[in-house]
Amino acid sequence: MNEARAAKVGEKKLLILQTIAEMLERPAVEKVTTALLAKQLQVSEAALYRHFASKAQMYEGLIEFIESGVFSVIAQIEAAEESGLKQAEAIVASLLRFAQKNRGLTRVLVGDALVHENPRLQARINQLLDRIESTLKQSLKVASAQGALAAEHDFAAHADLLVCYAVGRWQRFVKSGFKDDPLASWSAQWPILRA
């Protein structure tokens, strides 16, 4: 009986998170309020707070989903690809693809949806970006060990550039109302970024 109830609670939490992400996909939605969310779900605001202690906790749930999705793909890339340079390429491409497929979550990634929210949410996004940068730095070091990059290559600066590129593409995607495809010029831009 308790397992069935826990599953139902989990389903309701997931539905709330999915609804927030869907609402964020609408460029006209400036801010998701609990009142708007409750109206969309056809429940009371009190019903939302039975599942999440605060709105910040709802966004934390979205960030956890983003982390899980991004890093599971990165782990698959690292396991499947031996070339450090190809790992870096695939990781950045996967970040752009994630934005393409998850428009609402991209607004969370660029901080657009977090304006006027708890500052710890932006700190979580910053930590996520730092982890991605560390992963890219490691892939670039592997590329150097394989002879694809010079030993004196500045791995930190290169990894930072790749993260800045991805964040910039996400930003353009969001600010264009999801019209400027993050992967539009990827095949032409990667050779420049790889150097």
Which positions does each model-derived feature cover?
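C-terminal peripheral helix-coil segments that are non-catalytic and often amphipathic
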Residues: 1, 90, 94-101, 134-146, ...
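Basic, helix-initiating cap at the start of DNA-binding domains
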Residues: 1-27, 31-40, 57
